[in-house]
Amino acid sequence: MASNESGGGNLMDEFEEAFQSCLLTLTKQEPNSGTNKEEIDLEVQKTTNRFIDVARQMEAFFLQKRFLVSTLKPYMLIKDENQDLSIEIQRKEALLQKHYNRLEEWKACLSDIQQGVHSRPTPPIGSGMLQGPGGGMPPMGGTPPRPGMMPGMPPGAMQPGGPMQPSPHMLQAQQMQQLRMISRQMPPK
């Protein structure tokens, strides 16, 4: 073990050899060589244990070097921590910027929807005009209401006044209410 600790190169070479022998043992296929399953299992166990042992020795070697650096040059640890923190800050700033961009997109979308709703002329409530199947926007919650159904009503219930679609004014009021609810749920900047 003293010879392994004297140079990191020898330990690195041993680690590489142990890894290669472990892979070789696991991947070789010699069904006609006369070896039985127990011998193969024993060889796999042996090479795997050697690989784990060399890996532990290498870990101890690097931990010793890290300890030496921390005692002889403590500013190096602080420098490493500062670098890690600055990388983390950059990552979080990029994430925040991404969220701000998405928020701006949603605000623009809501603004467009609100302007579109206010700029459309609304017929009087009692005009009796029915919406066509493609007219108007579907509610924000999902699928458009079926003919004869108001949004939020159970499928078997009839709306008052018969199986008519709600008036455009009613849809506009519902959409405005949904927009207000969404804008209340959005976190402030």
UniProtKB/Swiss-Prot annotation:
Keyword terms of this UniProt record: Activator, Coiled coil, Nucleus, Transcription, Transcription regulation
Gene Ontology CC: one annotated term: mediator complex
GO molecular function terms noted in the UniProt entry: transcription coregulator activity
Pfam family, one: Med28
Matches recorded under InterPro entries: Mediator_Med28 (IPR021640)
Record's keyword annotation contains Transcription: yes
Region ranges (Disordered): 124-147
Coiled coil: 75-115
GO BP annotations, alphabetical order: regulation of transcription by RNA polymerase II
Biased composition (Gly residues): 129-139
Task performed by this protein: Component of the Mediator complex, a coactivator involved in the regulated transcription of nearly all RNA polymerase II-dependent genes. Mediator functions as a bridge to convey information from gene-specific regulatory proteins to the basal RNA polymerase II transcription machinery. Mediator is recruited to promoters by direct interactions with regulatory proteins and serves as a scaffold for the assembly of a functional preinitiation complex with RNA polymerase II and the general transcription factors.
Subunit record text: Component of the Mediator complex, which includes at least CDK8, MED4, MED6, MED11, MED14, MED17, MED18, MED20, MED21, MED22, MED27, MED28, MED30 and MED31.
Protein name (database record): Mediator of RNA polymerase II transcription subunit 28
Name of encoding gene: MED28
